[in-house]
Amino acid sequence: MATPYVPVPMPIGNSASSFTNNRNQRSSSFGSVSTSSTSSKGQLEDSAVGSLKQTNVQDQMDSASSMCGSPLIRTKFTGTDSSIEYSARPREAEEQHPEAVNWEDRPSTPTILGYEVMEERAKFTVYKILVKKSPEESWVVFRRYTDFSRLNDKLKEMFPGFRLALPPKRWFKDNYNAEFLEDRQLGLQAFLQNLVAHKDIANCLAVREFLCLDDPPGPFDSLEESRAFCETLEETNYHLQRELLEKQKEVESLKKLLGEKQLHIDALETRIRTLSLEPGASLYVSRAEGGQILRVEPSVLQVNRDVLDEESRADHKPHFNSREAGSVIAGIEVAQLAYNAEDD
């Protein structure tokens, strides 16, 4: 009697499991949420066979450990000027377990930089999102409104108590109107702010895949990333050129001011040198503000010694030295002159 044929599940090799793991772990810029949803359906189908699931889990852990040991090329937009640099380093331990990441290590609020209407095959709109994991590390991802909607549906299933405000869909109207797209961009920005405001939601797998927190995209992963990379370089170059022109104008202005000050100093030195070489020259007291020049002749400060001697003898007053009188009068005249110059 022939025995009936019963199929026996066989374990899948390490190469196949690693290939599946690599395909599911790396999500592209477009449709990353849809890709992860497809992989979740495949996992539900695999859960029907108990022994096969255990074998696959063990193989995936082995392949994940070998994959995390390899270097990872990351793109960094550093500083306020968004300059670009690259670093090759192995994945960190917390990337293997996203649920173990500290709340302090969560990314800052993603910023939607703008939108663009694509018309290559089918017309659609993509939103350019700037994600900052740390002040030194940031990257750009591109998402459609459909990606936001799918993420919102997933979060409703995972967190029934939370209700995130997502801009509604628009029916029977033009979805590519500029005013409508700007309003939708503001609504999506508020949606992202609510995502990172809650600890559990910000660290869940769906959000991490949506923002590519575990595997940031490189500048050459797709055409969109390459174009964003070039646009960032162009914008940085433009700002640097403007700053350079402003600095050059400031330098020219300072050079002109320095030349004027140097001419003024040279004129003062020439005048001082002239006065020191001519001891009998007149004394000048000038004011630069009003342009007034006061001149005192040496003859004004001289006193006729003979006249003073005769007057003192006629009045029978005590005799005093005419030189002392001249010095006193000269001191009085100079003091009065200095006081008047300060008043003017």
UniProtKB/Swiss-Prot annotation:
Residues 1-10 have a biased composition (Pro residues). Residues 223-278 form a coiled coil. Residues 27-40 have a biased composition (Low complexity). Residues 14-26, 52-68 have a biased composition (Polar residues). One of its GO terms (molecular function) is identical protein binding. GO terms for cellular component: early endosome; early endosome membrane; endosome membrane; late endosome; late endosome membrane; lysosome. The modification Phosphoserine is found at residue 222. The keyword Manganese does not apply. Keywords: Coiled coil, Cytoplasm, Endosome, Lipid-binding, Lysosome, Membrane, Phosphoprotein, Protein transport, Transport. Its main location: membrane. Residues 1-72 are annotated as: Disordered. It is found in: Early endosome membrane; Late endosome membrane; Cytoplasm; Lysosome. A 1,2-diacyl-sn-glycero-3-phospho-(1D-myo-inositol-3-phosphate) binds at residues 144, 146, 184. It is a peripheral membrane protein. InterPro entries: PX_dom, PX_dom_sf, SNX16_PX, SortingNexin/PXDomain-PKLike. The keyword Coiled coil applies. GO terms for biological process: early endosome to late endosome transport; endosome to lysosome transport; protein targeting to lysosome. Residues 105-218 form the PX domain. Belongs to the sorting nexin family. May be involved in several stages of intracellular trafficking. Plays a role in protein transport from early to late endosomes. Plays a role in protein transport to the lysosome. Promotes degradation of EGFR after EGF signaling. Homooligomer. Interacts with EGFR. The PX domain mediates interaction with membranes enriched in phosphatidylinositol 3-phosphate. This is Sorting nexin-16. It comes from Mus musculus.
